[in-house]
A protein has these predicted regions:
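Glycine-rich dinucleotide-binding loop and its adjacent helix/turn
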Residues: 2-9, 109-112, 158-216, 220-222, ...
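Rossmann-like nucleotide/phosphate-binding core characteristic of flavoprotein oxidoreductases
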Residues: 1-15, 23, 30-45, 54, ...
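Glycine-rich active-site loop/strand segments that organize a redox cofactor
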Residues: 47-112, 223-241, 342-356, 396-399
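Feature captures the FAD/FMN-dependent oxidoreductase FAD-binding
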Residues: 86-158, 163-166, 265-277, 293
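Phosphate-coordination loops involved in phosphoryl transfer and adenosine-cofactor binding
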Residues: 13-15, 131, 193-196
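Rossmann-like dinucleotide/flavin-binding elements
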Residues: 19-38, 186-232, 304-306, 326-378, ...
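Glycine-rich beta-alpha-beta "Rossmann" dinucleotide-binding loop(s) and their flanking helix/strand
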Residues: 159-186, 279-324, 352, 356
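A Rossmann-like FAD-binding core segment of flavoenzymes
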Residues: 215-315, 378-386, 390, 394-431
Length: 501
């Protein structure tokens, strides 16, 4: 007989299993529970919060939460200013991270982020089987899955992998890089005092290490083949964030830090440290560095275990699984992904900008959309959808464009979709992946989203499907990002006239 303190979800059969208790897994579990989808959550961790218990190494996140914002806290619109709390329709579960922030920065510390996630898990009553390591997976003849764990075998018809991009990754084609500590093995800053430090990689983890070592290192060099992509220039959260750009300013002002475009050709151990051989790319030429320490800030991959043996394909140097717009493996139906892994569903990538799915502010909405998709398609649940009168469509879409956090955080990736049918009427289909809307086809409908144009202007964009063809209509921007004005409503009404008349 089970005891009250026994861990939940003993080995057995469950309709759906979520692997992982980081923010992606917790968000998905909460969303599934709200819809009434029975599932189990398994994790190797001993507590929720995943990588935030260890990283970022220098404590502060690069995503902000603004305790004081021009909108009321615990509202949907406030999520626009709170990039770190999980999302819920329950006002008591909204905006939990700012509760734990001490006011010294609007970038939460990892401890503040951890406490926010723990509070969400506890207050939402999300049961998790901790200390249960995923060890392997089999696909059965009936299409179901057997998940081998340290606690025994589990069976399910739907499997969602939310283990994060947590596997340290290094490029295999650089001789000697196996001797180089990865970002996750970074020592305490004092260990780099008066040392020459070479950092392989110029993305956020590389700039984070460089920024943290500025008061300690004698000299810092960051290098990778391509120029650094900066968020303030690319208008993309996937680029190096301004939070860590002091080393870049040090470089451009000649302060002794160097940010170089160079391909690393070899790393050798020497009696006093390392010798790094490189070849300039933007400015061709051989380069050689004698340094005391080297750090490989070369990123992470997804620990997929044996999923590739089941047919799950990968890309990005095998670091991400390929996914449909609804985050499902194209080759293995029934295997889905949540959390930061969902950046493997690329979307339209307009103007070369990726989605916001690598971080909480983006993938929390992916998880909510995924929960509804799974409920409808895997469990045949008939979820209610709101009907609209014709004269309600323009005000409703204008309001969404003015402040729906899903559209602002997942620009050109998620969209509010409204379908128009002569028999069924006008229906709010909900938030959907924009790529799905554009590629799938169907009856008359509209998808409204926010996009940042090639010139960096943020503006509303509406995709109208009429007579089987999709037309893209760009509305005017606004210097104060107010897209609910009378002029925007007028433009919106004109765009929608063909399907609403």
């Amino acid at each position: 007989m089970a005891q009250l303190d026994d861990p939940p979800f003993p080995p057995g059969r469950y309709p759906l299993i979520v692997l992982g208790s980081g923010p992606g897994g917790i968000q998905l579990s909460h969303s599934l529970s709200r819809l009434g989808v029975d599932h189990a959550v398994l994790t190797a961790d001993e507590q929720p919060a995943g990588m935030f218990r260890r990283f970022p190494f220098f404590q502060r996140l690069i995503t902000w939460t603004k305790p004081y914002a021009p909108t009321e806290r615990r509202t949907r619109r406030y999520e626009w200013f709170d990039w770190n709390s999980l999302a819920s329709d329950d006002s008591g579960l909204k905006a939990l991270v700012p509760e734990f922030m001490d006011g010294t920065s609007y970038f939460p510390s990892r401890a503040e982020m951890q406490r926010g996630l723990e509070a969400f898990t506890e207050r939402a009553g999300i049961p998790v089987r901790y200390g249960c390591s995923w060890e392997g997976t089999r696909r059965e003849n009936d299409g179901s899955f057997t998940v081998g764990t340290s606690d025994g075998e589990y069976r399910c018809g739907t499997l969602v992998v939310a283990v994060g991009m947590t596997e340290p990754w290094k490029p295999a084609d650089i001789p000697g890089i196996d001797q180089v500590p990865h970002y996750v093995e970074t020592d305490a800053p004092e260990a780099y005092a008066d040392r020459r430090v070479f950092i392989i990689g110029k993305r956020n983890s590389g700039f984070e290490i460089a920024d943290g070592l500025l008061p300690w290192a004698r000299q810092i060099v960051l290098a990778s083949p391509r120029p650094a992509r900066l968020s303030i220039l690319t208008h993309s959260v996937a680029a190096a964030r301004a939070r860590y750009l002091q080393p870049y300013e040090d470089h451009v002002l000649g302060g002794g830090t160097f940010v170089l475009d160079a391909a690393i050709e070899r790393v050798e151990r020497t009696a006093s440290g390392f010798r790094v051989q490189a070849s300039g790319t933007t400015l061709p030429g051989a380069l050689e560095f004698e340094v005391d320490r080297v750090v490989a800030a070369t990123g992470f991959g997804t620990p997929l275990r044996d999923l590739p043996d089941l047919g799950v394909s990968t890309f990005h140097q095998d670091r991400l699984p390929a996914q449909t717009p609804f985050w499902e493996s194209p080759e293995v139906p029934g295997i889905f992904f949540a959390g930061s892994i969902t950046q493997g569903s690329i979307g339209l990538k307009k103007y070369g900008r990726p989605s916001g799915s690598a971080a909480v502010h983006g993938f929390r909405y992916n998880a909510r959309v995924l929960a509804e998709h799974v409920a409808r398609t895997r469990f045949e649940m008939d979820l209610p959808r709101r009907s609209l009168a014709a004269d309600e469509v323009v005000p409703y879409l204008a309001e969404e464009l003015a402040g729906a956090p899903e559209l602002w955080h997942q620009q050109a990736y998620l969209a509010r979709v409204i379908a128009v049918d002569r028999e069924r009427g006008i229906v709010d289909v909900g938030i959907l992946p924009l790529q799905h809307f554009v590629d799938r086809g169907g009856g008359d409908a509209v998808a409204a989203t926010i996009e940042t144009g090639e010139d960096g202007t943020i503006r509303p964009v509406v995709y109208v499907r009429h007579g089987g063809r999709v037309a893209e209509r760009v509305l005017d921007g606004d210097p104060l990002l107010d897209f609910g004005t009378a002029e925007h409503r007028k433009q919106l009404a004109a765009v929608l006239e063909p399907i609403l008349e």
